[in-house]
């Protein structure tokens, strides 16, 4: 059954070894997934939009950890590294509290999205060597009522009780400030970091990532168990690719059957993601800061 055009894309959770590979984001996008990943500590994760040509406007949105924000969020991005392991926050004094407070300041400035990343190839320059560009429709957060901004006068009325943005520039400086919605073209560096599903740094992203990675390691341990999958190594088969491929396929099938049998035999258990969220909320004494709607 084909999925609807506007259905949520399935998540693909990978470790940092894949996220740094050339064209990784392009492959994930073209296969119809939304990446969920972290970045090496040494990697630059804050990128401004492309510098405008003389006399033209800059797009404005700044990319922070793979997601786009209002230009006013740039000073906040420099205060704290957000994409981190939960154990790191646990080891810090009031680490969960500090992280939640940082999200309460930053997430309202998240740009709205009226589309997924769209692949664009110029008709005039189309050739086998043509490198496609990727674009996305972004909406000012003040237009969506998540913040109030003097550059969007209507937001002062509609979002009177929301956090206030105090820009030090005029609306003509950025396209995202002079217009309500823009179509932004990713720069090459922005595209390498892009994540269009969960917002990196958010509680949802951190909890899901660690749960998915934990489940992956659990499945690998089952595959490595000779008692469950019946396979220990590939040394006894002809060292030819077709035969090895068949053995690996049977290995995975046997593992899947073992997982299914184990699942049927056990009683239903509560979601580990929900349990972790409740645990964090008990630690904070209040609900976690959640990612605001972007559409």
Model-assigned labels for residue ranges:
Residues 23-40:
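A short alpha/beta connector and helix-capping loop motif
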């Amino acid at each position: 059954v084909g999925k609807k055009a506007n259905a949520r894309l399935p998540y693909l959770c990978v470790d940092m070894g894949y996220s740094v590979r050339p064209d990784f984001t392009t492959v994930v996008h073209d296969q119809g997934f939304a990446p969920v990943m972290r970045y090496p500590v040494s990697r630059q994760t804050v990128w401004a939009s492309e510098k405008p040509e003389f006399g033209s406007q800059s797009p404005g949105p700044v990319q922070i950890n793979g997601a786009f924000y209002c230009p006013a969020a740039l000073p906040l991005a420099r205060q704290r590294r957000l994409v981190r392991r939960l154990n790191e926050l646990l080891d810090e004094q009031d680490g969960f509290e500090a992280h939640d407070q940082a999200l309460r300041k930053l997430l309202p400035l998240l740009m709205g999205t009226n589309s997924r990343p769209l692949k664009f190839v110029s008709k005039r320059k189309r050739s086998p060597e043509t490198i496609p560009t990727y674009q996305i429709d972004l909406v000012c957060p003040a237009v969506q009522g998540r913040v109030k901004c003097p550059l969007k006068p209507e937001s002062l009325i509609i979002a009177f009780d929301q956090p206030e943005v105090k820009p030090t520039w005029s609306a003509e400086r950025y396209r995202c400030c002079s217009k309500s919605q823009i179509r932004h073209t990713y720069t090459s560096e922005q595209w390498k970091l892009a994540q269009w599903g969960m917002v990196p740094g958010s509680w949802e992203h951190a909890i899901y990532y660690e749960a998915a990675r934990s489940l992956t390691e659990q499945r690998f341990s089952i595959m490595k168990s000779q008692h469950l999958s019946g396979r220990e190594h590939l040394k006894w088969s002809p060292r030819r690719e077709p035969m090895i491929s068949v053995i690996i396929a049977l290995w995975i099938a046997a593992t899947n059957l073992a997982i299914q049998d184990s699942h049927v035999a056990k009683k239903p258990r509560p979601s580990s993601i929900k349990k972790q969220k409740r645990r964090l909320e008990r630690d904070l004494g209040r609900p976690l800061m959640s990612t605001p709607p972007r559409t």
